[in-house]
Amino acid sequence: MTATVVIGSQWGDEGKGKIIDFLGQSADVTVRYSGGDNAGHSLVVNDQKLALRLIPSGILAPNSICIIGNGTVINPATLLDEIKELNGVGVNTDHLKISDRAHIVFPYHILQDQQQERDRSKNGEKIGTTNKGIGPAYMDKMQRIGIRAIDLLDNETLEEKIAFNLEQKKRILDEDLWNQLPSLKELTAQYIEYGEILKDYITDTSYLIHTNLNDNKRVLFEGAQGTMLDIDHGTYPFVTSSNPTAGGAATGAGIGVTKIKHVIGVCKSYVSRVGEGPFPTEQINEVGDRIREIAHEYGTVTKRPRRIGWFDGVLMKYVSEVNGLTDLVVNCLDVLSGFKELKICTGYQTDHGVIKYYPASEKELKNSTPIYETLPGWDEDLTQMTTYEELPANAKNYLKKIEEITGVPVSAFSIGPDREQTIVLNDMWSD
């Protein structure tokens, strides 16, 4: 029995999909446990690049079970589009399963999201939401008025719950947004149809996961986004509405924490971020522009240019502790080729002195000045290398410095976007 969790160790977009695809070839079950269609991951199928938002990366492994867990919020329209797109390139989705406890996104959630962001913008407090309705869907979940996947299979219950929710939203939504909503009859008919199409996918996925763990199967949990977007542990309020951290795998999939053997943190050799919020090591200069263009740093879902910064060791130490990381995977090492010098942040200079921890205060983060350790770079092209031994000495030292700061071994690193460009140093499936 092996349960392995893969989490993003920065602000998302760390390349988790590639690593999950790589590890997923040996997994019997792959589980997405948090978030919704606000989080995108890219996969390559038959030389075609696909951008998935809901379906786990493990869908490409035909002999494994692919699960969307109870901790997610699902927009059925997006999900069906993804199923259609995958089928169109020859990927069978019959092994996809959806938790009957997962909550469902409705059009009123999306409109509520737009209204909230519009109101925040008036006060200069824009968060940078993707306007996919994720936050409002989680709000309804916490207020205990949400509609779950299981409700899509009971027409009478579904209509009653939609009617109740529409009454609530009419009190909340501005008139111009309220008028964009379908009628109760239209909305109910649409979601009954979704239920008919998805009924064979919807099941008790927690039971399914436990059955496989008890049969000594390998279960891979894939987190969306990243630790620094976690509702509890991220750079609040510039965060998502769920828990993409390792702890979220237990609640978002319905398993006990003692079942988890490995927690793999995926990070880049530098840092990127989409949207608003503090970013101590951000490089709004030639360095940031250069990395962005080399690595094509634009959001999978939003297409927005990502903000770029030097590797933040303070952040990574915090992330390793919050998640209990057992392994690190460092992506995009090849992107740093050609830099004469590389910098790693080892502390923050604040108004109160030097700190080595990641502060909760947004104000303190914004006013922090990173303290850097400078390392020599390398000129060699890494993309054709196949072993750790081939790396130039300075690239090896860069990885060793990351291990030293985090206290977590680098078990794999990538030197390009393809699965074959992942070099594994330690077994991340061992019992």
Swiss-Prot record:
Pathway: Purine metabolism; AMP biosynthesis via de novo pathway; AMP from IMP: step 1/2. The active site is at D13 (proton acceptor), H41 (proton donor). GO terms for biological process: 'de novo' AMP biosynthetic process; IMP metabolic process. It is an enzyme of class 6 (ligase). GO terms for molecular function: adenylosuccinate synthase activity; GTP binding; magnesium ion binding. Mg(2+) binds at D13, G40. InterPro entries: Adenylosuccin_syn_GTP-bd, Adenylosuccin_syn_Lys_AS, Adenylosuccinate_synth_dom1, Adenylosuccinate_synth_dom2, Adenylosuccinate_synth_dom3, Adenylosuccinate_synthetase, P-loop_NTPase. GTP binds at residues 12-18, 40-42, 306, 332-334, 414-416. IMP binds at D13, E14, G15, K16, N38, A39, G40, H41, T130, R144, Q225, T240, R304. Its EC number is 6.3.4.4. Its cofactor is Mg(2+). The keyword Coiled coil does not apply. The keyword DNA repair does not apply. Residues 115-125 have a biased composition (Basic and acidic residues). Substrate binds at T300, V301, T302, K303, R304, P305, R306. It is found in: Cytoplasm. One of its GO terms (cellular component) is cytoplasm. It catalyses: IMP + L-aspartate + GTP = N(6)-(1,2-dicarboxyethyl)-AMP + GDP + phosphate + 2 H(+). Binds 1 Mg(2+) ion per subunit. Homodimer. Belongs to the adenylosuccinate synthetase family. This is Adenylosuccinate synthetase. It comes from Pediococcus pentosaceus (strain ATCC 25745 / CCUG 21536 / LMG 10740 / 183-1w). The gene is purA.
